[in-house]
Amino acid sequence: MEIKFKTSIILCLLTLLAINSSAQEIVKQFTKDSYSIQKLQDLKKEFGTNKIIPTLYEPQILIALSYFPELKNTTIEFRLKKTNTPLSSRPNLLGLLQSSKKRRYIITISEATNSRLEPILLKNLNFNAQIGVLGHELSHVSDYMNKGFGKMTNLLWIEIFSKKQVDKFETRTDHICINHGLGYQLLDWSSSVRKNLNIEYWRGADNLQYMTKKERYLNPETIIQVLKSKALYNEVTSLNIQKNQHDN
């Protein structure tokens, strides 16, 4: 019994070390010049396996993917399409019947939508905010990876019949994104949405026409408070982004 206990402790420590070693540096502000061409090629080699990535957004997607090491071998297609919702993520329908690790996931990036939502399409966000919302969508995929057929079916039911539960689901997804190290990018996206749409509360594209004080996604003030409560972010007060270029 004692040997088994010690073995369990060792395994836990090794797991924590593995997670720590794969963790990315917390960066407050990414720009198009943050990484060299060689660095982006390295990211593609490490995180681009089983990924279909549109060239237009390749740097942003690769940077976001680098914060989700658990998705290294996951099949994900980033698809450009004209849709009302600026971004969305889901497993392919047949994938619901497969184990989570064998599923193919689709992240749809809208190229055109109605005039009201046009300002928050990915192409109209700044580079840092783009990484933030992509991190949110990858957080969905990471979450889906832990859900079997039953839980995924329940999630579908929630999306159709319970706005309140969807609010909780999206809020939790924002927390997943923050815990993966993209809190500042999520903050940039959250601020950009409210600024670009000239709104105070954001409950998603499908609820834009309704005046409501309910939040589906974390607002900037809440994100700031969450970041302050995380040791991971307290250790970072400022960062010269050019450091990433000098490292290559």
Residue ranges of model-derived segments:
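Bacterial Sec-dependent N-terminal signal peptides
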Residues: 1-25
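A metal-dependent hydrolase signature that marks the N-terminal structural subdomain at the beginning
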Residues: 22-100
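Residues that cap or delimit alpha-helices
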Residues: 61, 65, 69, 116, ...
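Post-HEXXH active-site segment of zinc metalloproteases
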Residues: 128, 143-171
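Active-site recognition of the HExxH zinc-binding catalytic motif
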Residues: 132-145
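An active-site-proximal "capping" alpha-helix that borders the catalytic cofactor pocket
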Residues: 166-183
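Long, well-structured alpha-helical subdomains associated
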Residues: 179-248
